[in-house]
Curated annotation (Swiss-Prot):
Protein name listed in UniProt: Biotin synthase
Domain of life: Bacteria
Region Disordered: start-end pairs: 330-353
Residues binding [2Fe-2S] cluster: 110, 141, 201, 274
Gene3D superfamilies, alphabetized: Aldolase class I
Keywords assigned: 2Fe-2S, 4Fe-4S, Biotin biosynthesis, Iron, Iron-sulfur, Metal-binding, S-adenosyl-L-methionine, Transferase
CDD domains in the cross-refs: Radical_SAM
Segments of skewed composition (Basic and acidic residues): 334-343
UniProt cross-references to InterPro entries, sorted A to Z: Aldolase_TIM, BATS_dom, Biotin_synth/BioAB, Biotin_synthase, Elp3/MiaA/NifB-like_rSAM, rSAM
Molecular function as annotated in GO: 2 iron, 2 sulfur cluster binding; 4 iron, 4 sulfur cluster binding; biotin synthase activity; iron ion binding
PANTHER family tied to this protein: BIOTIN SYNTHASE, BIOTIN SYNTHASE, MITOCHONDRIAL
């Protein structure tokens, strides 16, 4: 892509496509780094304020004991990670946490439960949590595993804004990471959520042992859905002792991570791209390159689901150095304030959203 093509991009309106080929996606991912970043940043500015980042806070409302066997996750009952299983939290405690998150600048509250799927008896307290968060003027996001049509409709009726359900990696590599469910199961749940009218938060994890082509294919799967996920979390694996993948995980090259962010931004120009789990292992310079490449959302707070996060004071300092301001929430009545999961997916001992 030459400089004339790039210059013409600046004035263009982003086109939402759902027909990306492997070759097209790979060609963008492999552009010279400066051209890739310029293209991503240009497309980013067509839909977003380049100096604004949306802030989310994540809470684990039900920890551990999960029946799934996701190879990266500390919350799986299949792995010996010394993480005790807990019962579902009291909705009142969850709502107290949401208030504190709102006061710290979060406009969205993400709640993760380590389940394969919720039981019907779990729905009443979960719905109470959603309604309580919404009453604070915040957006509510949940990640609870696979849903039935009826459960998705109940969540929609309660006012749930987002549902997180990550595809983690490419379809080809998926069975190397998770064996207790299929890639198709993930896509089925995404369709169930979208059919209920809930926005989708769906991304993946880098550092599972995948190849760069798997990262490209993961994003191509999302970009070719009938509707792009409104939120796309990109997580860096935090290897957790006791999980199978911790033994084989290899660090991701920082520039490869930034390329993945840029490709997500270019292929899904209207979606929020979240720099999710793994920021504690990233330098300020790497995070700033991610923002330059089109990331415009983070998790704030000291912890995600079961893994560490930089913390509000460190994030405030970084934002100040970069001239970034947190996105304001949408005005709501009585308020001006607006998921391993940790790989924001409840199955991620990391963070999901």
């Amino acid at each position: 892509m030459n400089s004339i093509d790039l210059a013409s991009l600046a004035a263009a309106t982003p086109t939402l496509r759902h027909d990306w080929t492997r070759e097209q996606a790979a060609a963008i991912y492999n552009l010279p780094f400066a051209d890739l970043i310029f293209r991503a940043q240009t497309i980013h500015r067509q839909s977003f304020d380049a100096n604004e980042v949306q802030c989310n806070q994540l809470l684990n409302v039900k920890t551990g004991g999960c029946a799934e066997d996701c190879g990266y996750c500390s919350q799986s009952a299949h792995h010996d990670t010394a993480l005790p299983a807990s019962k579902l939290m009291d909705p009142k405690k969850v709502i107290e946490g949401a208030k504190a998150a709102r006061d710290a600048g979060a406009t969205r509250y993400c709640m993760g439960a380590a389940w394969r799927s919720p039981k019907d008896r779990d729905m009443a307290p979960v719905i109470e949590m959603v309604k309580g968060v919404k009453a604070l003027g915040m957006e509510a996001c949940m990640t609870l595993g696979m849903l039935t049509d009826d459960q998705a409709q109940q969540l929609a009726d309660a006012g749930l804004d987002y549902y997180n359900h990550n595809i983690d990696t490419s379809e080809e590599f998926y069975s190397s990471v998770v064996k207790s469910r299929s890639f198709g199961d993930r896509l089925d749940t995404l369709a169930t959520v979208q059919d209920a009218g809930i926005k989708v938060c769906c991304g993946g994890i880098l550092g599972l042992g995948e190849k760069p082509t798997d990262r490209v294919e993961m994003l191509r799967t999302l970009a070719n859905l009938p509707q792009h996920p409104e939120s796309v979390p990109i997580n860096m694996l935090i290897p957790i002792e006791g999980t199978p993948i911790a033994k084989t995980a290899k660090p991701v090259d920082p520039f490869e991570f930034v390329r993945t962010i840029a490709l997500a931004r270019i292929m899904m120009p209207k979606s929020d791209v979240r720099l999710a789990a793994g920021r504690t292992a990233m330098s300020d310079e790497m995070q700033s390159l991610c923002f330059l490449a089109g990331a415009n959302s983070i998790f704030i707070g000291d912890t995600l689901l079961t893994t560490p996060n930089p913390g509000d004071s460190k994030d405030r300092m970084l934002f100040a150095r970069l001239g970034i301001t947190p996105r304001e929430g949408a005005p709501v009545e009585a308020h001006s304030h607006d998921h391993d999961h940790d790989h924001h997916d409840h199955h991620h001992g990391h963070s999901h959203s």
